[in-house]
Each structure stands twice: as structure tokens, then as C-alpha cells.
Amino acid sequence: MVRIVFKFLIPSVRAGRRGLRRASKLGLILAALAALSACAWLDTKQRQLVYRPTPGVPAGFTGLRVGDLSFATQVPGVEPGTRDSLQMWWLPHANSRAPTLLYLHGTFRNLYRNLPKIDALREAGFSVLAVDYRGWGESSPIIPSEATIYADANVAWAELARRQPEPRLRVIFGHSLGGGVAVELASRMRHGSDYAALILESTFTSLPDVASAAGWLGSLGALFASQKFDSAGKIAKVDAPILMLHGDADQTVPVALGRQLRDAARKDTRWVEISGGSHSRLHSDAPEAYQQALKLLIAQLG
């Protein structure tokens, strides 16, 4: 009788164990899917908070100057099989032999809000190709990411190279987060054969470092940052002359982070620290020092 009981009991126990294992695996899969969903949600929220892109054209904008060009190009979309629109401006200098600068802006403000700084760069002697990453201005309205911004900068650089065939007259410029984009771009190219110089204004070491500088809550957020822009880890690969400008009254990116980035770069990096300079208006906070630094760089390009 005992043997008969065990004969039926043992297979039942084994089946129960197999069922538990299957249930455990299913539970792990469901937990993993839930975690991935939470991570995806967190990543989306991070990107919305970090970039805060400004779409559209501001009220009251009357257009670019005569001779300046606003145009769009098509790029692979975020969703497979789709196409997105990438808006660029071509703002040539009166001197046809002027060096050409790729303008990479930071968070929040689109190109329309960057016009005063762009005008200051043209005043110094640059032709300017400026790009609104997808999510900003008249480019396709997406929630941008570090990857999409890098991709957009690559497309803009190809356009600049088409318009300016001489590498010795090509310059990369990045303001704030745009500096992180500029460092990424420059770190994958070579001085002389690809471009001539890199200009960074109000730029940071990395986004997690900016968050940490805001206090303990920012330090906690930095632990979960999906958007890095790790310029400090890349800038040593930049072999071209570098000009860095930063205001000592910058309330967005502390000047200490700019100094740390300078220290991670090549030893002959030129550092211009503007007394009382803010985050976004160095061109108007100290116009003489700003213009002098840019014109000296242009003179060195030959």
C-alpha cells in the first residue's frame, strides 16, 4: 500500500517542483519586464527634464538677414522606417575666406534664442552653420536623447564639410550642453585632416557632475542618470587647439566644472575666465574680451 502511495506521490511532487520552477521563471520574466518598463519611463522623464526643448518659432521673429539661409534635411527617424526633419541655418560671412564654425547650442533655447551669440561669432569673423537638434525649433518634435543629438551633430558636420572643403577653416563650437556634443564630435576626428579648432563656452565635465554640484538631491539623481555627455572622459582625445570660455558667476554650470574640464584637456588649451560672466551671455557680459579671444583664434588658423 505504501509503495502504491509513493508511486503516485513522487511524480506529483516532481510535477509540482517543475510547476514552481516555471512559475519562478515567469515571475522573473515579469519582474524584468516591469523593471525595464520602469527604466524606460525613468529614461523618458530624465530626457524631458534635462533637455526641455523649445519647439517652434518665437512670436515676433521677422526672419533671418538677407543672404542667410534656413533649410531642412531629412534624417532617419526614431521609429524604424520613418524620416525626421533636421533644421539648419547657413549664415555666411561677408569674407568668402572666413573660417566656418559649426554652432551647437545647449538645452532649452532653440536657434532663435541663440541669435545674439551667433551674431557675436559672425562679428568676430566666422561663417556659421547652426543646427537645431530634433525636438528644438522647426526640427521634428521628438523627445531628444544623447544619441539623437550626437546623430544630428554628425549630419550637421557633414553639411559643414560640404560647404567648407578646407579642414584648416573648419571650427567646432559648443555652448553648455552643446559643448558636450562638440567634444564628442571632435574626439572622433583629427586635427588638420578634419578640422582646425574646438571652442567650448560654459561647458561641463559631465551631466552627472552638474547634477551633483546642485546638492545631495542632485547627487542622488546623478546615480541614475541615463544622459551622460562625459566630456571629461573624452577631451584628452581631442588633438586640435582648444579655446575655453567660462564666466566665474555662472549659476548653471559652476566655473569649477569648467576648470576641471580644462585640466583634463591638452596642456596648451587656452582658458578665458570672464569676471562676473554669466552662463549664456558672455558675448554681452564682456564683449571686448569675448571678441578678442575669438579673433586671436582666427588669426592662429592662418
Regions flagged by a language model, labelled:
Residues 117, 240, 254-263:
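Short alpha-helix in the alpha/beta-hydrolase fold that links the catalytic acid
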Residues 277-287:
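Catalytic histidine-centered segment of alpha/beta-hydrolase-like enzymes
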Residues 238, 244-246, 250:
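Short beta-strand/loop motif that positions the catalytic acidic residue
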Residues 82-159:
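Membrane-embedded segments
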Residues 165-176:
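Alpha/beta-hydrolase fold nucleophile elbow
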Residues 181-240:
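Hydrolase active-site cap/lid region
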Residues 249-253, 280-281:
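Acidic catalytic loop of the alpha/beta-hydrolase fold
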Residues 36-78:
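An N-terminal hydrophobic leader/cap segment in hydrolases
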